[in-house]
Amino acid sequence: MSIIVALDAKSQYDALKIVEQLDPTLCRVKVGKELFTHEGPSVVKKLQEENFEVFLDLKFHDIPNTTAQAVCAAADLGVWMVNVHASGGRKMMETCVERLKAGNYQTQLIAVTVLTSMGREDLKDIGLDIEPVEQVKRLAKLTKESGLDGVVCSAQEAKILRELIGQDFSLVTPGIRPEGSNADDQKRIVTPKQAMLDGSTHLVIGRPITNAENPTEMLKSILASIA
């Protein structure tokens, strides 16, 4: 399944109301920091009870041992995917991979490169005088070398990364907006069809689906556009 629906909800109740209108055979769902902080692991279990595979989007970033423990705790919940910040470095990422393998977990582990809301000036503010795409390339290569399953990247960078890294690597792309949607707070955006053509393997889509009058029909429309 290529579509991951971002559950931008504050409560378990709101999240479950959203997934009531979705088909778990057509999409996976993403639980982020706000929802998980409000509701904890119970919201993951409830979504799994509704047969949804969960991407736990908590972007762990800490010393290697602490990050690996957090990743394994997420895997203990049975989530399909979890992520870390690639800027945590090689040792941090390699430790996470080693612990997942040691525990025989099936959870996919990916890394965040450059947040999609960040442009060159934002990077400059934190001491990186570099174009976002160059930093993305650097961190994506490090992620692959560290043994992770993929990265989060913008669709504009997907084609470059596919050529740089090869086929056996997931490119999970937020900032996806169907034709006519608002950009909201994502700076580097593109349509679902173009993202898939450029090499993305999974598309993270939130408000265009969850705020639609009929979320299932919107989801089916997006799937048809990338078929």
Curated annotation (Swiss-Prot):
Catalytic activity: orotidine 5'-phosphate + H(+) = UMP + CO2
Highest rank taxon of the organism: Bacteria
Binding locations of substrate: 8, 30, 57-66, 116, 177, 186, 206-207
Transmembrane segments: none
Protein's UniProt name: Orotidine 5'-phosphate decarboxylase
Keywords linked to the UniProt accession: Decarboxylase, Lyase, Pyrimidine biosynthesis
Family: Belongs to the OMP decarboxylase family. Type 1 subfamily.
Broad enzyme group: lyase
InterPro entries: Aldolase_TIM, OMPdecase, OMPdecase_AS, OMPdecase_bac, OMPdeCOase_dom, RibuloseP-bd_barrel
GO biological process: 'de novo' pyrimidine nucleobase biosynthetic process; 'de novo' UMP biosynthetic process
Entry's Gene Ontology cellular component terms: cytosol
A GO MF label: orotidine-5'-phosphate decarboxylase activity
Gene name, Swiss-Prot/TrEMBL: pyrF
Keyword Lyase: yes
Function: Catalyzes the decarboxylation of orotidine 5'-monophosphate (OMP) to uridine 5'-monophosphate (UMP).
